[in-house]
Amino acid sequence: MPQGLVKPANQVVVSGDPLVVEYEVGANATAAKMLPGRVVIFDDTDYSVKEAGAKTHGVVGFLDVAPDKKEADAYAVGDQARVVKGECIAKLILLASENVTRGDALVTAADGKLAKQAVGAMGSQGDVVGHAEESSNVTVDAEILVHWRPSAEPAAAS
């Protein structure tokens, strides 16, 4: 039987040794959406982040679990948040009703979640932030394994 990656409890990074940087949760962030495994972008002030929206360009990274917290604990506005910026395999949140297959390119969706990149004009769907490591097709938000490696340039799906 083949070996595979296991989704660990209370951590987001599954494999790899990525760069992790602390940023402040910005004033424009929605605290309830600032959960580990959600994608973030820069907020209005230096060194601050907020949840990414759909089709975002300029992704900073995704939120990691604070050492003294649990995976279900959201960061509050003003908290110092751990943001993973480097390449790794991570357990991230796929938007409900997205049908992805291993290897599909992923882009940001609302509230810092991920969605499958659809066929479209180059750059019209935001940055490709990674690729699905497993398939998913459920009607609720789902944790999936993602090869996190944000692209430097937008690319169209084919």
Each language-model region and where it sits:
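Surface-exposed, low-hydrophobicity beta-strand/loop segments enriched in small/polar/acidic residues
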Residues: 1-158
